[in-house]
UniProtKB/Swiss-Prot annotation:
Record GO terms (molecular function): peptidyl-prolyl cis-trans isomerase activity
Protein name, entry field: Trigger factor
SUPFAM superfamilies reported for this sequence: FKBP-like, Triger factor/SurA peptide-binding domain-like, Trigger factor ribosome-binding domain
Claim: Cell division is one of the keywords in the record: yes
Top EC class, one word: isomerase
Gene transcribed to yield this protein: tig
The entry's keywords: Cell cycle, Cell division, Chaperone, Cytoplasm, Isomerase, Rotamase
PROSITE patterns: FKBP_PPIASE
Length: 444
């Protein structure tokens, strides 16, 4: 096997590899000999399977394993020549060229190493911003939202028509082609008008009804309706309204304050307002950071700091972005790309600049996290994945296993580190500015 290594820049090197067919064949035979001692095959006793039988049945798999072993050996030889260690590598070696002729393999690999980055003066790049302000109206609206969670529907005493936001207690029976259908009947059913729990048109048809009124409401079941025999069918619902209910919002008395402020010794409206103000401010700041500040800061970091990028990582990121974009291509565009290598390469190259920015930012964030001592432990990683699973109604353990199988845990961890990092950068600044503003008021 011939291996020639060449350093391209501070973080990239090439390894030109030539593997003779005889070496591949020899490695395949060695693997077959080892496998023959443990493989189970009908007609043979354990440990007595002939090598020829193993080769015949598993030649393809053995060849793949043999080539993989030889390339690992080639990479180790290249690292020795470059005076590098395997732990310095980032990502997998990237095949820039791979040719097979008469059993011989000729390949060109890109080996990439982690860049050294100095982020002197990064603090000056943190964008300036105003601490979000919270007014009384916003606090009152948030308070109303909280109180609504403890509210209960109660029958109204005044005579008026049903309107959106009311709760209606009514009987109904549905008919398709003048025939009642299963599951289309109920008595004393309670429905919030405007909640869109029923099929389109039903709740709108009830608006304006009065207590005791009977009405036929005509609707059409959606094409995608769960019960196939009703999908896209016209129907008539005979409805009788018994009661109109309104949400009764509880008063903000001492008992309610204790519910809204559990564990607070001196529960009061003032304490609640202060906590709601802080909550709203943090929500606004979170939105500001994610919608504006994070992007500005990232762009400034990318523009200011220049260093050699690991080519293999950039190529892998480009491939990933290209694959993701395939979902947005039209069938015609996909066919054109499959038919023309030039068009495919041109399209792929269009993602290169964005891939370079993404890789660059990843290394910058990694270095920033180290500077600011930001870490994410295994427990935090698992909790984040479990929380995601619960949000989407998935099995948390299976969700975690899927991430492991896809090799996606490092990406999830990096996303969590990034979130922690930006919170660390922007949130303390808010606290400092708040203290400064309070001091200013005191001085005045």
């Amino acid at each position: 096997m011939e291996v020639k290594a060449k350093q391209l820049d501070s973080v990239n090197a090439t390894a030109s590899v030539k593997i003779p067919s005889g070496m591949i064949k020899s490695e395949v035979e060695n693997l077959a000999k080892k496998a023959s001692k443990s493989v189970k095959m009908d007609g043979f006793r354990p440990g007595k399977v002939p090598v020829s039988a193993v080769l015949k049945r598993y030649e393809r798999e053995l060849t793949q394993d043999a080539e993989q072993n030889l390339f690992k050996s080639a990479v180790n030889s290249a690292l020795q020549e470059l005076k590098k260690e395997s732990k310095e590598l980032v990502g997998e070696p990237y095949f820039e060229k791979f040719d097979r002729k008469d059993g011989e393999i000729i390949a060109e690999l890109i080996l990439s190493f982690k860049p050294e980055i100095k982020l002197d003066g990064y603090e000056k790049l943190i964008p300036e911003y105003q601490t979000p302000k919270v007014n009384k109206k916003e606090i009152d609206e948030k308070k109303d939202e909280l109180l609504k969670r403890f509210s209960t529907p109660e029958a109204i005493k005044t005579k008026r028509a049903l309107k959106e936001g009311d709760f209606a207690k009514f009987d109904f029976e549905g008919f398709v082609d003048d025939k009642a259908f299963e599951g289309g009947k109920a008595e004393n059913y309670v429905l919030e008008i405007g909640s869109k729990q029923f099929i389109p048109g039903f709740e709108d048809g009830m608006v304006g009804m009065k207590i005791g009124e009977e009405k036929d409401i005509k609707v059409t079941f959606p094409k995608e309706y769960g019960a196939a025999h009703l999908a896209d069918k016209d129907a008539v619902f005979k409805v009788k309204l018994h009661e109109i209910q309104e949400l009764k919002i509880p008063e903000l008395d001492d008992e309610m304050l204790k519910k809204l402020l559990p564990g607070e010794e001196k529960a009061s409206v003032e304490v609640l307002d202060e906590k709601l103000k802080e909550q709203i401010k943090n929500e606004k700041l979170f939105k500001l950071v994610n919608d504006e500040l994070k992007g500005k800061f990232a762009d400034a970091l990318i523009e200011k700091y220049n260093f050699d990028l690991p080519k293999g990582i950039v190529e892998q990121e480009t491939d990933m972005q290209m694959r993701a974009a395939f979902n947005t291509f039209s069938e015609k565009e996909i066919e054109e790309l499959k038919a023309s290598k030039e068009k495919y390469q041109e399209k792929r190259d269009s993602f290169k600049e964005e891939a370079q920015k993404s890789v660059k930012l990843t290394f910058i964030i990694d270095e920033l996290a180290k500077l600011r001592k930001i870490e994410v432990n295994d427990q935090e990683l698992i909790q984040a994945i479990y929380f995601e699973a619960y949000r989407y109604g998935m099995n948390p353990k299976e969700h975690l296993e899927n991430y492991k199988k896809q090799g996606a845990l490092p990406a999830v961890k990096m996303a969590l580190i990034e979130e922690k990092l930006f919170n660390d950068i922007f949130m303390p600044k808010t606290e400092k500015s708040e203290k400064a503003s309070k001091k200013e008021k005191e001085d005045k």
